[in-house]
Design a protein with these regions (language model features):
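Conserved N-terminal beta1-alpha1 strand-loop-helix module at the mouth
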Residues: 1-219
Length: 219
């Protein structure tokens, strides 16, 4: 079980995440997002962020050449495509970097139909909550829709995950659909302001999830 903290804008917080064992950090390259990194983290600053934490760039309908230039300049390990990117576009990008394609769900969406055309063109899926725009809503969708689906690719679970969800998540991991869960994605419910994380909340959540995983590994 891995944890991704998205919407990072402060290099010192990324380093702190790495030290506490967070697996992935998300950086939003979508100008309309309140967590857009813009000039907050330059390519030079990003390259100075060392450690084991993987750097994930979040993009929304960015043209291919601009996206690939950003991947190279920021030395990104993965890209998360959160817009209307086609399977052909995803496959083109996936020839050079790991691609996570995001799908925004309501409570009764036919997941198999949504992901079918992306099966061969992406490395992983992400399931997030449907909202008016492309950004996160800070709200959960009903995870039952995942339990009712056959998901044949590893995926991220996102959308309104917050402190206090640890038990619910641990129960989800035990479901058959939990076997394909690559990582959980947290963001706005762990902030003091957009792009600035409440590190104590994150630390407690990470510890609780890691402790539960360690207990399960010894059973």
């Amino acid at each position: 079980m891995r944890i991704k903290v998205c919407g990072m804008t402060l290099p010192e917080q990324v380093l702190a995440l790495d030290e506490m064992g967070v697996d992935l950090a998300g950086f939003i390259f979508y100008p309309k997002s309140p967590r857009y990194i813009g000039h907050k983290i330059s390519p030079e600053k990003m390259r100075q962020i060392k450690g084991r934490i993987a750097k994930v760039g979040v993009f929304v309908n960015m043209p291919y050449d601009e996206l690939m230039k950003t991947v190279e300049e920021y030395r990104l390990d993965m890209v998360q495509l959160h817009g209307d990117e086609s399977p052909v576009f995803c496959e083109k990008v996936s020839n050079y970097v790991t691609v996570v394609k995001a799908f925004r769900l309501s409570d009764n969406d036919p997941i198999e139909w949504m992901v079918k055309s992306y099966h061969d063109s992406t490395d992983m899926y992400m399931f997030d909550t449907l909202g008016a725009g492309y950004g996160g809503t800070g709200k959960k969708f009903d995870w039952t829709v995942l339990k009712k689906s056959v998901i044949d690719k590893i995926y991220f679970l996102s959308g309104g995950i917050e402190p206090g969800d640890e038990e619910k998540l641990n129960e989800f991991f035990k479901e058959p659909v939990g076997k394909k869960l690559f990582a959980i994605d947290i963001n706005s419910r762990f902030e003091v302001s957009a792009g600035v994380k409440d590190m104590e909340k994150v630390r407690k959540f990470v510890k609780a999830m890691k402790d539960e995983q360690a207990k399960k590994d010894t059973e």
